[in-house]
């Protein structure tokens, strides 16, 4: 699998040094469980990035059962964005304006999280776009092959036993 190394690297960046259980690798996506926190997440690295990346970008869907949080979208851009620029996620013909801080982006609320995931389930690719501090476009493109399976594995991985 072409993205295996990226997925593992992205997962390591996404989580503290706590032990993680790999729930599965699904084409360009993977699912992990961190039993100590506890939390589970589906994660992928971009298939393509426009321009030179200054950090490892990734997109994740997180589940935090103790906090009552599920299906939470999180994106880390490949470069630091301009303070005044928006972060736009596009999937399946739909566009979503994320809230952002630095190179990080989140859905504005649970309704948007679920709408993004619904769009992901019916699309083949997803892009996250913004403007970098240098004034150049940031475009991180993700393949969605395996995303539904990884999201489902992460959701099931955090169901209380």
Roles of regions detected by a PLM:
Residues 2-9:
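Sec-dependent signal peptide recognition
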């Amino acid at each position: 699998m072409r993205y295996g190394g990226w997925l593992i690297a992205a997962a390591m960046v996404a989580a503290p040094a706590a032990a993680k259980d790999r729930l599965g690798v699904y084409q360009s996506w993977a699912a992990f469980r961190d039993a100590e926190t506890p939390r589970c997440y589906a994660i992928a690295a971009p298939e393509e990035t426009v321009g030179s990346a200054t950090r490892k970008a990734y997109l994740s869907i997180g589940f935090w059962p103790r906090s009552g949080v599920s299906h939470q979208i999180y994106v880390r851009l490949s470069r630091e964005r301009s303070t005044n620029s928006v972060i736009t996620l596009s999937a399946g013909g739909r566009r979503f304006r994320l809230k952002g801080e630095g190179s990080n982006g989140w859905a504005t609320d649970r309704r948007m999280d679920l709408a993004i995931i619904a769009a992901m389930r019916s699309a083949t690719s997803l892009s996250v776009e913004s403007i970098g501090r240098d004034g150049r476009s940031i475009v991180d493109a993700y393949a969605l092959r395996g995303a539904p399976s990884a999201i489902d594995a992460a959701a099931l991985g955090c169901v209380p036993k």
